[in-house]
Design a protein with these regions (language model features):
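N- and C-terminal low-complexity/disordered segments
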Residues: 2-140
Length: 140
């Protein structure tokens, strides 16, 4: 009987240790999770973010390359996107609505590295830019 109790105790200890080890590898609930930046959905969100940045600009910027993507589940989804930008061929004041197909880069020279956080609630058709910050490419 003592052997049986010792065996059950040992199994419990091993299972508890295995459970705590696997928890450390899981993403924190509500935390940021790294995603694959080659997913076209994320590129579209980056283009959406640049399309909202018009104040004080003559031309829209456009996305050159998506560098990093993170997602966070909240009451919807937050997307944190890091990408490079340059000026596009689309003048803002002409009334042309931004699109990644129409607003091509004037050059392939990186003018800024930007980070945008976009909040979406798909089932309520909500999408908005919570923050948008850019730095010179050599500052990153």
């Amino acid at each position: 009987m003592a052997f049986f109790k010792a065996a059950v105790f040992l199994v419990c200890v091993v299972l508890a240790a295995a459970g705590s080890a696997s928890k450390s590898k899981r993403a924190l609930v509500g935390g940021w999770k790294t995603q694959d930046p080659t997913n076209p959905k994320f590129e579209n969100l980056a283009h959406y973010a640049v399309s909202t940045q018009v104040e004080g600009r003559e031309y829209y910027d456009t996305v050159l390359e998506l560098l990093e993507v993170q997602t966070q589940i909240v009451a919807g989804v937050n997307y944190k996107l890091k990408f490079t930008t340059t000026q596009s061929t689309c003048k803002i004041e002409t009334g042309v609505e931004y699109s990644k197909e129409l607003c091509q880069p004037k050059t392939n020279k990186v003018e800024a590295v930007c980070t945008a956080v976009i909040y979406t609630v798909p089932w309520q058709n909500i999408k908005r830019v919570l923050s948008y910050n850019c730095e010179a490419p050599n500052d990153v």
